[in-house]
Amino acid sequence: PADIESMTVLKDASAGALYGARGANGVIMITTKQGKEGKTKVSWRSTAGWSSRSLKAYDMVDQKEFVQLTYEGLRNGYIFDNGYNWEAAGRQASADLGGVLGGEQYNPFKNYTWGTIIDPATGRVQGDATSAWNESWMDAIQRDNAFRHEHQLSVNGGTEKTKYMFSLGYLNEDGILINTGFQRYNARANINTEVNKWMKTGLNVSLSNSTQNFSDYEGSSNSNVWYSAQFMAPIYPVYIKGEDGKDVLDADGNRQLDYGDGSVQRPQYSDFNPVGGLVDDKADIKTDVAGLRTFLAFGSDSEDAGWAKGIKLTLNFGLDYRNKSQKSYMNMHHGNQAAAGGLLMKYNRRTQSYTFNQ
Protein backbone atom coordinates (compact mmCIF):
# COMPACT_ATOMS: atom_id res chain seq x y z
CA PRO A 1 0.00 0.00 0.00
CA ALA A 2 2.84 2.42 0.71
CA ASP A 3 3.90 2.14 -2.96
CA ILE A 4 0.52 3.32 -4.33
CA GLU A 5 0.32 6.84 -5.75
CA SER A 6 -3.31 6.82 -6.95
CA MET A 7 -6.22 4.60 -8.02
CA THR A 8 -8.63 5.18 -10.92
CA VAL A 9 -11.76 3.22 -11.80
CA LEU A 10 -12.51 2.74 -15.51
CA LYS A 11 -16.02 1.69 -16.49
CA ASP A 12 -18.04 0.94 -19.58
CA ALA A 13 -16.49 2.05 -22.89
CA SER A 14 -13.16 3.21 -21.49
CA ALA A 15 -12.51 -0.16 -19.84
CA GLY A 16 -13.62 -2.10 -22.90
CA ALA A 17 -11.49 -0.03 -25.25
CA LEU A 18 -8.35 -0.92 -23.30
CA TYR A 19 -9.03 -4.48 -22.16
CA GLY A 20 -11.87 -5.80 -24.33
CA ALA A 21 -14.05 -8.51 -22.79
CA ARG A 22 -11.77 -8.73 -19.75
CA GLY A 23 -12.78 -5.20 -18.82
CA ALA A 24 -16.54 -5.79 -19.05
CA ASN A 25 -17.01 -5.38 -15.30
CA GLY A 26 -14.73 -2.37 -15.05
CA VAL A 27 -11.02 -1.93 -14.44
CA ILE A 28 -9.15 -0.51 -11.48
CA MET A 29 -6.01 1.31 -12.58
CA ILE A 30 -3.37 1.51 -9.83
CA THR A 31 -0.52 3.97 -10.32
CA THR A 32 2.53 3.26 -8.19
CA LYS A 33 4.94 5.88 -6.96
CA GLN A 34 7.73 6.87 -9.32
CA GLY A 35 11.13 8.42 -8.95
CA LYS A 36 11.55 12.20 -8.90
CA GLU A 37 14.36 14.27 -10.29
CA GLY A 38 16.90 15.28 -7.69
CA LYS A 39 19.32 13.89 -5.18
CA THR A 40 18.76 10.39 -3.91
CA LYS A 41 16.41 10.36 -0.94
CA VAL A 42 16.20 7.47 1.49
CA SER A 43 13.12 7.18 3.70
CA TRP A 44 11.98 4.75 6.36
CA ARG A 45 8.43 4.27 7.59
CA SER A 46 7.37 2.07 10.50
CA THR A 47 3.96 1.48 12.04
CA ALA A 48 2.89 -0.69 14.95
CA GLY A 49 -0.39 -1.50 16.60
CA TRP A 50 -2.56 -4.08 18.27
CA SER A 51 -5.67 -5.95 17.17
CA SER A 52 -8.56 -7.20 19.26
CA ARG A 53 -12.21 -8.09 18.85
CA SER A 54 -14.19 -5.16 17.49
CA LEU A 55 -17.30 -6.18 19.42
CA LYS A 56 -17.39 -7.11 23.07
CA ALA A 57 -18.22 -10.76 23.73
CA TYR A 58 -21.69 -11.59 24.99
CA ASP A 59 -22.14 -12.10 28.70
CA MET A 60 -22.00 -15.83 29.44
CA VAL A 61 -23.44 -17.83 32.31
CA ASP A 62 -20.95 -18.79 35.02
CA GLN A 63 -20.47 -22.23 36.54
CA LYS A 64 -23.19 -21.92 39.18
CA GLU A 65 -25.67 -20.48 36.69
CA PHE A 66 -24.97 -23.29 34.23
CA VAL A 67 -25.50 -26.00 36.84
CA GLN A 68 -28.64 -24.25 38.07
CA LEU A 69 -30.12 -24.03 34.56
CA THR A 70 -29.25 -27.66 33.81
CA TYR A 71 -30.94 -28.76 37.03
CA GLU A 72 -34.03 -26.66 36.28
CA GLY A 73 -34.26 -28.13 32.78
CA LEU A 74 -34.18 -31.67 34.17
CA ARG A 75 -36.64 -30.88 36.95
CA ASN A 76 -39.12 -29.15 34.65
CA GLY A 77 -38.92 -32.05 32.22
CA TYR A 78 -39.95 -34.48 34.94
CA ILE A 79 -42.79 -32.19 36.00
CA PHE A 80 -44.28 -31.43 32.58
CA ASP A 81 -43.33 -34.57 30.66
CA ASN A 82 -43.61 -37.23 33.36
CA GLY A 83 -46.14 -35.76 35.77
CA TYR A 84 -43.82 -35.67 38.81
CA ASN A 85 -44.63 -33.31 41.66
CA TRP A 86 -42.17 -30.55 42.55
CA GLU A 87 -40.32 -32.47 45.29
CA ALA A 88 -40.05 -35.74 43.37
CA ALA A 89 -38.92 -33.94 40.22
CA GLY A 90 -36.24 -32.11 42.20
CA ARG A 91 -34.92 -35.32 43.76
CA GLN A 92 -34.77 -37.07 40.41
CA ALA A 93 -33.09 -34.10 38.74
CA SER A 94 -30.39 -34.03 41.44
CA ALA A 95 -29.86 -37.77 41.04
CA ASP A 96 -29.46 -37.43 37.27
CA LEU A 97 -27.32 -34.28 37.29
CA GLY A 98 -23.97 -36.07 37.45
CA GLY A 99 -24.81 -38.37 34.55
CA VAL A 100 -25.81 -35.43 32.38
CA LEU A 101 -22.77 -33.29 33.22
CA GLY A 102 -20.12 -36.01 33.05
CA GLY A 103 -19.59 -37.39 36.53
CA GLU A 104 -17.58 -36.07 39.47
CA GLN A 105 -14.49 -35.65 37.27
CA TYR A 106 -16.12 -32.53 35.86
CA ASN A 107 -17.58 -31.23 39.12
CA PRO A 108 -15.66 -28.05 39.97
CA PHE A 109 -17.38 -27.74 43.36
CA LYS A 110 -15.26 -30.14 45.38
CA ASN A 111 -17.08 -29.44 48.66
CA TYR A 112 -20.25 -30.96 47.16
CA THR A 113 -21.10 -33.88 44.91
CA TRP A 114 -23.41 -33.50 41.92
CA GLY A 115 -26.12 -35.16 43.96
CA THR A 116 -25.87 -32.61 46.77
CA ILE A 117 -24.91 -29.43 44.91
CA ILE A 118 -28.58 -28.36 44.76
CA ASP A 119 -30.19 -27.27 48.03
CA PRO A 120 -33.44 -29.31 48.20
CA ALA A 121 -35.12 -26.60 50.27
CA THR A 122 -34.59 -23.85 47.71
CA GLY A 123 -33.94 -25.77 44.51
CA ARG A 124 -30.84 -23.67 43.93
CA VAL A 125 -27.07 -24.23 43.94
CA GLN A 126 -25.65 -24.37 47.45
CA GLY A 127 -24.59 -20.88 48.48
CA ASP A 128 -21.22 -21.93 49.90
CA ALA A 129 -20.21 -24.05 46.89
CA THR A 130 -16.67 -23.05 45.90
CA SER A 131 -15.05 -23.78 42.56
CA ALA A 132 -11.67 -25.48 42.25
CA TRP A 133 -11.18 -24.09 38.73
CA ASN A 134 -12.72 -21.43 36.54
CA GLU A 135 -11.06 -21.37 33.13
CA SER A 136 -12.32 -19.31 30.19
CA TRP A 137 -12.21 -21.18 26.89
CA MET A 138 -12.48 -17.96 24.92
CA ASP A 139 -9.54 -16.43 26.79
CA ALA A 140 -7.54 -19.62 26.21
CA ILE A 141 -7.81 -19.48 22.39
CA GLN A 142 -7.36 -15.71 21.97
CA ARG A 143 -4.60 -13.16 22.30
CA ASP A 144 -5.66 -10.15 24.33
CA ASN A 145 -3.79 -7.76 22.04
CA ALA A 146 -2.42 -9.23 18.82
CA PHE A 147 0.69 -7.25 17.85
CA ARG A 148 1.19 -5.89 14.34
CA HIS A 149 4.23 -4.09 12.92
CA GLU A 150 5.11 -2.98 9.39
CA HIS A 151 8.27 -1.39 7.96
CA GLN A 152 8.99 0.21 4.58
CA LEU A 153 12.33 1.37 3.16
CA SER A 154 12.29 3.43 -0.05
CA VAL A 155 14.95 5.04 -2.23
CA ASN A 156 13.92 7.79 -4.64
CA GLY A 157 15.79 10.03 -7.04
CA GLY A 158 17.00 10.59 -10.58
CA THR A 159 18.28 12.90 -13.26
CA GLU A 160 16.42 14.90 -15.87
CA LYS A 161 16.26 11.86 -18.14
CA THR A 162 16.21 8.88 -15.76
CA LYS A 163 14.21 8.56 -12.55
CA TYR A 164 14.03 5.63 -10.17
CA MET A 165 12.26 4.37 -7.07
CA PHE A 166 13.11 1.24 -5.08
CA SER A 167 11.31 -0.07 -2.01
CA LEU A 168 11.48 -2.94 0.44
CA GLY A 169 8.72 -3.83 2.89
CA TYR A 170 8.04 -6.20 5.77
CA LEU A 171 4.79 -6.91 7.63
CA ASN A 172 4.24 -9.20 10.61
CA GLU A 173 0.78 -9.47 12.12
CA ASP A 174 -0.29 -11.83 14.90
CA GLY A 175 -3.80 -13.23 14.62
CA ILE A 176 -6.37 -12.85 17.37
CA LEU A 177 -6.38 -16.65 17.66
CA ILE A 178 -3.23 -18.17 19.18
CA ASN A 179 -0.78 -19.71 16.69
CA THR A 180 -2.24 -17.72 13.80
CA GLY A 181 -0.77 -14.79 11.94
CA PHE A 182 0.40 -13.26 8.68
CA GLN A 183 3.88 -12.38 7.45
CA ARG A 184 4.84 -10.69 4.18
CA TYR A 185 8.00 -9.52 2.41
CA ASN A 186 7.70 -7.25 -0.62
CA ALA A 187 9.99 -5.38 -3.00
CA ARG A 188 9.51 -3.01 -5.92
CA ALA A 189 11.68 -1.33 -8.55
CA ASN A 190 10.30 1.45 -10.75
CA ILE A 191 12.57 3.00 -13.40
CA ASN A 192 11.66 5.45 -16.17
CA THR A 193 14.09 6.89 -18.70
CA GLU A 194 14.04 9.18 -21.72
CA VAL A 195 16.27 7.45 -24.28
CA ASN A 196 16.19 10.39 -26.69
CA LYS A 197 13.83 13.13 -27.87
CA TRP A 198 11.39 10.67 -29.38
CA MET A 199 11.66 7.52 -27.23
CA LYS A 200 10.78 6.85 -23.59
CA THR A 201 10.65 3.57 -21.72
CA GLY A 202 9.95 2.34 -18.23
CA LEU A 203 10.04 -0.79 -16.11
CA ASN A 204 8.05 -1.57 -12.96
CA VAL A 205 8.79 -4.85 -11.17
CA SER A 206 7.17 -6.03 -7.93
CA LEU A 207 7.76 -9.14 -5.83
CA SER A 208 6.09 -10.42 -2.68
CA ASN A 209 6.22 -13.50 -0.49
CA SER A 210 3.64 -14.10 2.22
CA THR A 211 2.75 -16.80 4.74
CA GLN A 212 -0.59 -17.04 6.52
CA ASN A 213 -1.05 -19.39 9.48
CA PHE A 214 -4.71 -20.01 10.28
CA SER A 215 -7.27 -22.36 11.78
CA ASP A 216 -8.58 -24.76 9.15
CA TYR A 217 -11.91 -25.32 10.93
CA GLU A 218 -14.94 -23.36 9.82
CA GLY A 219 -18.74 -23.30 9.78
CA SER A 220 -20.74 -24.72 12.68
CA SER A 221 -18.61 -27.85 12.98
CA ASN A 222 -17.83 -28.96 16.52
CA SER A 223 -14.17 -28.67 15.57
CA ASN A 224 -14.52 -24.97 14.73
CA VAL A 225 -12.51 -23.44 17.57
CA TRP A 226 -14.57 -20.22 17.68
CA TYR A 227 -17.83 -22.17 17.72
CA SER A 228 -16.83 -24.81 20.25
CA ALA A 229 -15.04 -22.42 22.64
CA GLN A 230 -18.12 -20.20 22.87
CA PHE A 231 -20.50 -23.11 23.38
CA MET A 232 -18.33 -25.13 25.77
CA ALA A 233 -19.96 -25.24 29.21
CA PRO A 234 -18.02 -23.26 31.86
CA ILE A 235 -17.71 -26.25 34.21
CA TYR A 236 -15.40 -28.08 31.81
CA PRO A 237 -11.71 -27.25 32.30
CA VAL A 238 -9.23 -26.47 29.55
CA TYR A 239 -6.60 -28.60 31.32
CA ILE A 240 -6.86 -32.02 32.99
CA LYS A 241 -7.72 -31.83 36.68
CA GLY A 242 -7.14 -34.33 39.47
CA GLU A 243 -9.61 -35.34 42.17
CA ASP A 244 -8.50 -32.32 44.19
CA GLY A 245 -9.30 -30.00 41.28
CA LYS A 246 -5.65 -29.13 40.65
CA ASP A 247 -3.80 -29.46 37.35
CA VAL A 248 -2.39 -32.87 36.45
CA LEU A 249 1.11 -32.24 35.11
CA ASP A 250 3.08 -34.34 32.63
CA ALA A 251 6.60 -35.70 33.19
CA ASP A 252 8.08 -32.32 32.25
CA GLY A 253 5.89 -30.39 34.66
CA ASN A 254 3.57 -28.96 31.99
CA ARG A 255 -0.19 -28.75 32.13
CA GLN A 256 -2.04 -31.21 29.91
CA LEU A 257 -4.99 -30.28 27.73
CA ASP A 258 -8.27 -32.02 28.55
CA TYR A 259 -9.68 -33.61 25.40
CA GLY A 260 -12.69 -35.06 27.20
CA ASP A 261 -11.65 -38.63 26.41
CA GLY A 262 -10.45 -39.79 29.83
CA SER A 263 -11.97 -42.42 32.11
CA VAL A 264 -15.16 -40.35 31.98
CA GLN A 265 -16.14 -38.95 28.59
CA ARG A 266 -16.94 -35.25 28.52
CA PRO A 267 -20.57 -35.05 27.35
CA GLN A 268 -19.82 -31.99 25.24
CA TYR A 269 -17.26 -32.06 22.38
CA SER A 270 -15.72 -35.36 23.43
CA ASP A 271 -12.20 -36.01 22.09
CA PHE A 272 -11.72 -32.37 21.16
CA ASN A 273 -10.18 -29.30 22.75
CA PRO A 274 -10.33 -25.91 20.97
CA VAL A 275 -6.90 -24.96 22.32
CA GLY A 276 -5.52 -28.29 21.16
CA GLY A 277 -7.01 -27.69 17.73
CA LEU A 278 -4.82 -24.60 17.44
CA VAL A 279 -1.72 -26.24 18.93
CA ASP A 280 -1.79 -29.77 17.48
CA ASP A 281 -3.18 -28.98 14.02
CA LYS A 282 -1.49 -26.76 11.45
CA ALA A 283 -2.68 -24.92 8.37
CA ASP A 284 -0.85 -22.37 6.26
CA ILE A 285 -0.97 -20.67 2.89
CA LYS A 286 2.22 -19.51 1.21
CA THR A 287 1.89 -17.14 -1.72
CA ASP A 288 4.53 -15.85 -4.12
CA VAL A 289 3.52 -13.01 -6.42
CA ALA A 290 5.55 -11.32 -9.16
CA GLY A 291 4.44 -8.54 -11.44
CA LEU A 292 6.11 -6.77 -14.34
CA ARG A 293 4.93 -3.69 -16.22
CA THR A 294 6.88 -2.08 -19.03
CA PHE A 295 6.16 0.48 -21.71
CA LEU A 296 7.83 1.89 -24.79
CA ALA A 297 6.64 5.27 -26.08
CA PHE A 298 7.57 6.68 -29.51
CA GLY A 299 6.95 10.14 -30.90
CA SER A 300 7.06 13.75 -29.80
CA ASP A 301 5.75 17.21 -30.64
CA SER A 302 9.22 18.67 -30.21
CA GLU A 303 10.99 20.23 -33.19
CA ASP A 304 14.06 18.21 -32.21
CA ALA A 305 12.23 14.90 -32.72
CA GLY A 306 13.04 14.90 -36.41
CA TRP A 307 11.20 12.27 -38.40
CA ALA A 308 9.27 11.23 -35.26
CA LYS A 309 7.58 14.62 -34.81
CA GLY A 310 3.82 14.22 -34.64
CA ILE A 311 3.99 10.45 -34.31
CA LYS A 312 2.65 8.98 -31.07
CA LEU A 313 2.72 5.28 -30.30
CA THR A 314 2.80 3.63 -26.88
CA LEU A 315 3.25 -0.09 -26.29
CA ASN A 316 2.35 -1.51 -22.86
CA PHE A 317 3.11 -5.00 -21.65
CA GLY A 318 2.23 -6.61 -18.33
CA LEU A 319 3.05 -10.00 -16.87
CA ASP A 320 1.65 -11.44 -13.63
CA TYR A 321 2.71 -14.63 -11.87
CA ARG A 322 1.14 -16.14 -8.74
CA ASN A 323 1.99 -19.35 -6.93
CA LYS A 324 -0.23 -20.38 -4.02
CA SER A 325 0.57 -23.38 -1.83
CA GLN A 326 -1.74 -24.50 0.98
CA LYS A 327 -1.03 -27.21 3.54
CA SER A 328 -3.37 -28.57 6.20
CA TYR A 329 -2.47 -31.06 8.89
CA MET A 330 -4.94 -32.52 11.39
CA ASN A 331 -3.49 -34.84 14.01
CA MET A 332 -4.31 -38.53 14.43
CA HIS A 333 -4.92 -38.45 18.19
CA HIS A 334 -7.77 -35.99 18.75
CA GLY A 335 -10.30 -33.92 16.82
CA ASN A 336 -12.55 -34.67 13.88
CA GLN A 337 -9.87 -36.54 11.87
CA ALA A 338 -8.69 -38.86 14.66
CA ALA A 339 -10.98 -41.69 13.54
CA ALA A 340 -9.44 -41.53 10.05
CA GLY A 341 -5.89 -41.65 11.41
CA GLY A 342 -5.28 -37.95 10.81
CA LEU A 343 -5.26 -35.88 7.66
CA LEU A 344 -2.54 -34.25 5.58
CA MET A 345 -3.54 -32.21 2.55
CA LYS A 346 -1.46 -30.15 0.16
CA TYR A 347 -2.85 -27.90 -2.55
CA ASN A 348 -0.90 -25.91 -5.09
CA ARG A 349 -2.06 -23.50 -7.77
CA ARG A 350 0.10 -21.56 -10.20
CA THR A 351 -1.28 -18.93 -12.57
CA GLN A 352 0.31 -16.69 -15.18
CA SER A 353 -1.29 -13.94 -17.21
CA TYR A 354 -0.15 -11.19 -19.51
CA THR A 355 -1.62 -8.05 -21.01
CA PHE A 356 -0.52 -6.20 -24.12
CA ASN A 357 -2.04 -3.05 -25.55
CA GLN A 358 -1.06 -0.14 -27.73
Where in the sequence are the language-model features?
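Residues embedded in well-ordered regular secondary structure
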Residues: 36-178, 216-219, 246-248, 252-261, ...
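Solvent-exposed loop segments that connect transmembrane elements
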Residues: 221, 254-257, 261-263, 333-356
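Periplasmic N-terminal accessory/gating domains of Gram-negative outer-membrane beta-barrel systems
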Residues: 1-17, 49, 137-142, 146
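Extracytoplasmic loops and strand-loop junctions of Gram-negative outer membrane beta-barrel proteins
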Residues: 10-12, 133-139, 171-174, 271-280, ...
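Transmembrane beta-barrel strand/turn architecture of Gram-negative outer membrane proteins
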Residues: 3-6, 23-54, 159-246, 277-328, ...
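Active-site-adjacent bridging/hinge elements
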Residues: 4, 125-131, 162-167, 262-272, ...
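Eukaryote-specific, cytoplasm-facing alpha-helical/coiled-coil scaffolding segments in long proteins
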Residues: 71-73, 320, 324-325, 341-343
